[in-house]
Amino acid sequence: MNVESSLFCELTAEQLEAVLRAALDTQVVQARLLSGGLFNTTYFIQTATRGDVVLRVGPINRHLLLPYEHRLMEIEAQVYRICASHGIEASELLALDTGKTVIDRDYMIVRYLPGQNLYEFRQEEHLPRIMQELGDAVARMNAVTAPRFGRIDTVTSGGGFARWSEFLLSEVDEWIPLAQRAALLTCTECERLRSTFSEHAPLFDEITTPCLTHTDLGPGNLLVRTDGERPEFGAIIDPDRAFFGDPMFEFCQITWMLTDDFLRGYGGALPSDEASVRRRKLYRALRLCWDAYVWEMEYNKHEYMLSSMNIVRQIMNECERVSLQ
């Protein structure tokens, strides 16, 4: 059991049976808790009539969540539907319940894909090809566009923002009161953060096409299929924090995948002009703000919060120095 996260909580055998019966009209043959999750509680389940599936159960203590985190399963399900319609390798959604009709938590069920995530995969001789396949898959995901910027569920229901800067500033404004209550930054530092993003609005608004952006492409969220003649890239999973925005947000914090093979599949190197580099630096600051709140309030990892906020302060200082030149 995960004892660090305040959001994780296992289901009873009776609850597992109730969920599978309501969602798929089947029974549990065997259930096994999957490790690694801090936000959701995840199970591999062999069913009596529907094959092998993965059940993801939303968090307890929902009062701790960031506002958009209350809608993560809806967002994830919508991204899977988008990926399916565009031929992008992703999980196959089988069931979703955000009405809390069976248990007092959201849950979704996806078809199990045999294989390993990239963190676990150890067949080094296949990695160059798989990384190129991954680059191609991410490029195809980032090529999906929308009429407005914002969280997936907001945009697909007719909302969102006309300008990229408006979405980013709305996220900063939403985060600041939570950060102050959690003592992540001082009031003065929060004002500096808001001013930094506001002053860079023209730079952000050079981005005019809202693109589907996963935002959490860690190796644990990328699956390699191992059930064929040779391993191959299998699926992008856990896109619950996705939005329509600048696809370069993918690479502001998570840069491990930027190998020559990945970039070959992605279509080339990332832009390295001053404006692009500055944007990615500010995206990293926002990403770390989200992370810091999660580390402190949800996962009880105070030292990770401190590290994240120190980097945010460094980025603000760097941006202010450049502005003064």
Functional labels for PLM-detected ranges:
Residues 179-182, 218, 253, 290-302:
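A short secondary-structure junction motif
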Residues 53-55, 65, 284, 291, ...:
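Membrane-proximal envelope and lipid/glycan-remodeling enzymes
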Residues 32-174, 178-180, 184:
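ATP-binding pocket architecture of kinase catalytic cores
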Residues 210-213, 218-281, 291:
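Active-site Asp-x-Gly
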Residues 9-27, 101, 124, 128-132, ...:
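An alpha-helical support segment within catalytic cores of ATP-dependent transferases
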